[in-house]
């Protein structure tokens, strides 16, 4: 059984009385149970129509729900104005209760639905109370006491109790005693001690509370019934002594509150062969089963009471008002207000039935007649409130047959157990605290592992973004290199006056476009977007650590994020500085390029097509016309000189990044390189004319060996170029020949800037087929 329990509320609707039946708007043709105290079945029916009748204000829907003041279903009610007061509407209020009994319910049905479930609890040692509540003339006394031919729940309960006691006699000694009292005009009377025929005035009793705050009535008589006949005799005798008188509302009206209590004591039987010992204890189980028949509330105007009856009605209403106040206080425990149990003798007796150690069932008796409209409505409201009352129940077990010395020893043993349990609790508390700290650290370590896994996944997931970022950085570096070279070219072109102003402006336009490209690429180089993904992936874990006060773990995670950020920044720095600056080399290349223009022959000049393409890439101008294929100038045993003029896509071309990198494979085989003969730098070299067309001319130029090794910007004619020059005349002096140069040079193979440069005045040089000897002044032709 649960320690906390609510009051069970059941509603019983009594049938119409003979008088009420005659006042109905339409007399039903079915049998009617009369509610005048006898609840007899009426077979009389009339088809008369009453112009000033009453109506039914309660409709039962099922075992739990009823409707108060439902809409009228009688079609004649529309023409009968007396059924509903003027200006009022039907309330049509629904109430739900634990159990609902209609007009056709019998006493057995009410017993099984209300009292029978409490019988098992009483035998287990729990207190129980059943009381009937309602207005006068609603069937409370009939429900509790009944008649000999139709007994109430008291008789039915005692019958079931005696049957169960017979089954317990094998193991338990069960004692049953009964007391019966009434509260009349706030005075307590014993209903079993007085002779109904005696004219003596009954003695008034008082209410007391013992040390355990149990309510008792000193001087109250107790009877022990052994069979059902004795039980019925007690009930009849008590009802005979109870104060009753007829009123306008009820022909058999109870003028007092009646309380019948059944005291049950159970003691276990000891076996005949059971050894007696000092530690052996026997326990008594005590319980009280109370049945309370409350007097009905009544209105003086309805009952037309005068004199003594009026005083009785006032006292009844006073005690019921105190009961209603107690119910209201118990329904709202949050207010912790005082419950006025002492306002009435009735509430003092019901103190533990309402809010104490007791299981309580409240039977609300109501009338279906519209004559009791307000009383029925108030009764339903109080019953609905009583459902919210909570009670605490416990078994009433008392230990007996124990010597005083055993209590001292028991107390010592209990204290020892308490001390041991306290030590155990302290040790377990320390262990729990340690385990909690260990679990907390373990959970933090798990969070750290999860956070680092998230960081790794975030870093791996940003690989594409990192590659794109590095590519943007390299593109930006390439654009900056192109800008630097272009600015160098413009500066040297302006200093040497080798180019026209139109061409310089074209290059400056290209430089402006490079600036725009650099701005666009610079906007895309934003490592903060990647770093932000690292921070966002673990931000919730960092916040969790800070909320728990684990700043060390939060700082460790932040260090991991900073480490990943530094990796991204280092990748950017590596991409920016992965090649050495080549400003001095590129400047020397451009200077030698401009110095090369005056050295080109006027009518037959072999210019490598790659030189023009390299120059175009240098200034960023794409040739507008297709070029012809001209053999590359390749020095024997060395890399092509043309590669020095190409603008690399990345500065890594100037620096070997990895020894495992594959060597560059030339698409064409190396061709034999012809060198110029060494001649003193202070003397000029006379031209030599080769008349033999079959011989292959060789051109050598005497240069300082040191300058030759340091300055690699000279162009050397290839073997195919020499074959194309055999038909040209070689002269020793330099002559100007603008017209022949412009007419014979294939301008469609070069870019506009180079074409313009070649149109400038140039000096011719003579090519010799044999190297000159410094001594003897004779020429020696080398072997082919």
Swiss-Prot record:
Matches recorded under PROSITE patterns: KINESIN_MOTOR_1, KINESIN_MOTOR_2
Cellular location(s): Cytoplasm; Cytoplasm, Cytoskeleton; Chromosome, Centromere, Kinetochore; Cytoplasm, Cytoskeleton, Spindle
Region (Disordered): 677-715
UniProt keywords, alphabetically: ATP-binding, Cell cycle, Cell division, Centromere, Chromosome, Chromosome partition, Coiled coil, Cytoplasm, Cytoskeleton, Kinetochore, Microtubule, Mitosis, Motor protein, Nucleotide-binding
Coiled coil (residue ranges): 405-440, 463-483
Sequence positions that bind ATP: 134-141
Disruption phenotype: Simultaneous disruption of dam1 is lethal and leads to the cut phenotype (septation without chromosome segregation).
Pfam families: Kinesin
GO process annotations (BP): cell division; deactivation of mitotic spindle assembly checkpoint; microtubule depolymerization; microtubule-based movement; mitotic chromosome movement towards spindle pole; mitotic metaphase chromosome recapture; mitotic sister chromatid biorientation; mitotic sister chromatid segregation
Biased segments, Basic and acidic residues type: 690-709
Top-rank taxon, per record: Eukaryota
Kinesin motor domain mapped to chain residues: 6-389
Record-linked InterPro entries: Kinesin-like_fam, Kinesin_motor_CS, Kinesin_motor_dom, Kinesin_motor_dom_sf, P-loop_NTPase
Listed GO MF terms: ATP binding; ATP hydrolysis activity; microtubule binding; plus-end-directed microtubule motor activity
Gene Ontology CC, one term: kinesin I complex
Subunit-level organization: Heterodimer with klp5.
Chain's role: Has a role in establishing metaphase during mitosis. Required for chromosome segregation where it generates tension during kinetochore capturing.
PANTHER family assigned: CENTROMERE PROTEIN E (PTHR47968), KINESIN-LIKE PROTEIN KIF19 ISOFORM X1 (PTHR47968:SF13)
Family: Belongs to the TRAFAC class myosin-kinesin ATPase superfamily. Kinesin family. Kinesin II subfamily.
Protein's name in the database: Kinesin-like protein 6
Source organism: Schizosaccharomyces pombe (strain 972 / ATCC 24843)
Name of the coding gene: klp6
